[in-house]
Amino acid sequence: MTYVLPSLPYSYNSLEPFFDEKTMIIHHTRHHQAYINNTNSILNGTHYENLLIEELISKLNILSIENKLALQNNAGGHINHSLFWKWLKLNTILKDDFKIILEKNFKSVDFFKKQFEKIALSHFGSGWIWLIKKYDNTLRIVTTVNQNTPLMGKEISGISGIPILGLDLWEHAYYLKYKNNRSDYVNAFWNVVNWDEVSYRFFNISNM
């Protein structure tokens, strides 16, 4: 199987003024594409080249393959970005069914957002911040380094769970618009969160 760049469900300028068009173009067509190209190159001619990306990610800790760390970084970059694009959309509304879930886990939506922002800003260097669903249906905010994902499992990423929301903390995701001001980028994120997708993943995704 050759992995391909997924099309975005919106135009590159659809998230303006919060996520700018130039960043979206570069992020999607260059950064994400590079992760895909590298993953395909590493897997070419191996026993694993026909795995779906979700299968590959879930089995990383047991794969026997050269350049395993490079595969982890690049395959992680592919699946992380494939999810990320789905979490972005202007003008969606946090509906009551999932709002109740957030309030149950974090006392209030505002407190959840403040905790998410605090953890995102305290994360050193490149990585991702996630809202994950644990296997008891509780929610946790966690971060992973580089292109690690909770889908890789605790052995690799230090945490396991189902991502229902995530934000790219690599500088390439925001530097053109926000420079070194990660705080403004994280705050802007709330304006483009696709709450419909977040809610769908919580109520409908039990595993990858």
From Swiss-Prot:
Homodimer. One of its GO terms (molecular function) is metal ion binding. Its EC number is 1.15.1.1. Disulfide bonds: none annotated. The lineage of its organism: Bacteria, Pseudomonadati, Pseudomonadota, Gammaproteobacteria, Enterobacterales. Gene3D superfamilies: Fe,Mn superoxide dismutase (SOD) domain, Iron/manganese superoxide dismutase, C-terminal domain. The keyword Protein transport does not apply. It comes from Buchnera aphidicola subsp. Baizongia pistaciae (strain Bp). Destroys superoxide anion radicals which are normally produced within the cells and which are toxic to biological systems. GO terms for cellular component: cytoplasm. PROSITE patterns: SOD_MN. Keywords: Manganese, Metal-binding, Oxidoreductase. It catalyses: 2 superoxide + 2 H(+) = H2O2 + O2. This is Superoxide dismutase [Mn]. Pfam families: Sod_Fe_C, Sod_Fe_N. Mn(2+) binds at residues 27, 81, 168, 172. Belongs to the iron/manganese superoxide dismutase family. The keyword Metal-binding applies. Its cofactor is Mn(2+). Binds 1 Mn(2+) ion per subunit.
